[in-house]
Amino acid sequence: MAKLEFNVDMERDNKLLFRKEINYTIKFENDKTPSREDIRKLLANNYGSDESLIIVDKNRQETGKHEIKGYAKIYDTKEHAMLYEPDYELFRNKLKVKEGNQ
């Protein structure tokens, strides 16, 4: 993983849905764009959380810029993530595996 510079743009506790919501900016060197997995690891390290509790919802990158603006959610428990997140988000973030994929 390349050197990543992580900044929190906005953070709020959503007590109703048992999660923390984070808008962030990640700047990276002249290398490939960080994957969702890389971003989940970065968030887990910064927030002292388990990767299985983190949902990387959106990432937006402008062409030619080495910067990502994104939105992620950190749940209190995996059960809350499974309850409130749609299946496609759980599959994207590897919290749920499609049947038949080995």
Swiss-Prot record:
Positions of disulphide bridges: none
UniProt xrefs under InterPro entries: Nucleotide-bd_a/b_plait_sf (IPR012677), Ribosomal_eS24 (IPR001976), Ribosomal_eS24_CS (IPR018098), Ribosomal_uL23/eL15/eS24_sf (IPR012678)
Record flagged with keyword Repeat: no
GO cellular component annotations of the record: ribonucleoprotein complex; ribosome
Molecular function, one GO term: structural constituent of ribosome
One GO term of the biological process aspect: translation
Keywords per UniProt: Ribonucleoprotein, Ribosomal protein
Keyword Ribosomal protein carried by entry: yes
Entries under Pfam families matching the protein: Ribosomal_S24e
Highest taxon listed in the record's lineage: Archaea
Family the entry assigns: Belongs to the eukaryotic ribosomal protein eS24 family.
Protein name: Small ribosomal subunit protein eS24
Organism: Picrophilus torridus (strain ATCC 700027 / DSM 9790 / JCM 10055 / NBRC 100828 / KAW 2/3)
